[in-house]
UniProtKB/Swiss-Prot annotation:
Inactive GDP-bound Rho GTPases reside in the cytosol, are found in a complex with Rho GDP-dissociation inhibitors (Rho GDIs), and are released from the GDI protein in order to translocate to membranes upon activation. PANTHER family: RHO FAMILY GTPASE. This is Rac-like GTP-binding protein ARAC1. Interacts with SPK1. GO terms for cellular component: cytoplasm; nucleus; phragmoplast; plasma membrane; spindle. InterPro entries: P-loop_NTPase, Small_GTP-bd, Small_GTPase, Small_GTPase_Rho. It is found in: Cytoplasm; Membrane. The modification Cysteine methyl ester is found at C194. It is a peripheral membrane protein. GO terms for biological process: abscisic acid-activated signaling pathway; auxin-activated signaling pathway; small GTPase-mediated signal transduction. Residues 195-197 form a propeptide. It comes from Arabidopsis thaliana (Mouse-ear cress).
């Protein structure tokens, strides 16, 4: 039996968007009720996706600005990033292209990014928006638009609280590494012609 491939998956995104909850929900099928900024040990497990077994290593990062200099140290060797924003936070959505994409392109160019909208359960919760009048929901169409803008191969919306699509996030991350999307090649006129001398 051949050894399974190791995939390093790093979560990034603004503080309080639900990165740690997503990881805890995926690895333990439980939802932490208290907000504790980034308390998730690195985690590794064998996962089967499309018949292939991989050893998935999960790394959590702190989104707060206090960690801007420390956070990139965890990017080394990353095979894929899960870039999370909250579906109920316009600021976290805007920071995907303003802050996170420039940071990832600088420290880890060429590493694929799976874009993830978190807190799906709250997007349709009318009471949440009554209690938080400044909150603006992000639509699926806006998420898809952002995916195209940043060139991410996948966009997934999930809820760590209800577990909806949580497994799908990590399956997508594994798939992006095992079957990278084909890059569109632009052929120049010189490449099309064949000359024999």
């Amino acid at each position: 039996m051949s050894a399974s491939r190791f995939i390093k998956c790093v979560t990034v995104g603004d503080g309080a968007v639900g990165k740690t909850c997503l990881l805890i929900s995926y690895t333990s099928n439980t939802f932490p009720t208290d907000y504790v900024p980034t308390v998730f040990d690195n985690f590794s497990a064998n996962v089967v996706v499309n018949g292939a077994t991989v050893n998935l290593g999960l790394w959590d990062t702190a989104g707060q600005e206090d960690y801007n200099r420390l956070r990139p140290l965890s990017y080394r060797g990353a095979d894929v990033f899960i870039l999370a924003f909250s579906l109920i936070s316009k600021a976290s959505y805007e920071n995907v292209s303003k802050k996170w994409i420039p940071e990832l392109k600088h420290y880890a160019p060429g590493v694929p990014i799976v874009l993830v909208g978190t807190k799906l359960d709250l997007r349709d919760d009318k009471q949440f928006f009554i209690d938080h009048p400044g909150a603006v929901p992000i639509t699926t169409a806006q998420g898809e638009e952002l995916k195209k803008l940043i060139g991410a191969p996948a966009y997934i919306e999930c809820s760590s609280k209800t577990q909806e699509n949580v497994k799908g996030v990590f399956d997508a991350a594994i798939r992006v590494v095992l079957q990278p999307p084909k890059q569109k090649k632009k052929k120049s006129k010189a490449q099309k012609a064949c000359s024999i001398l």
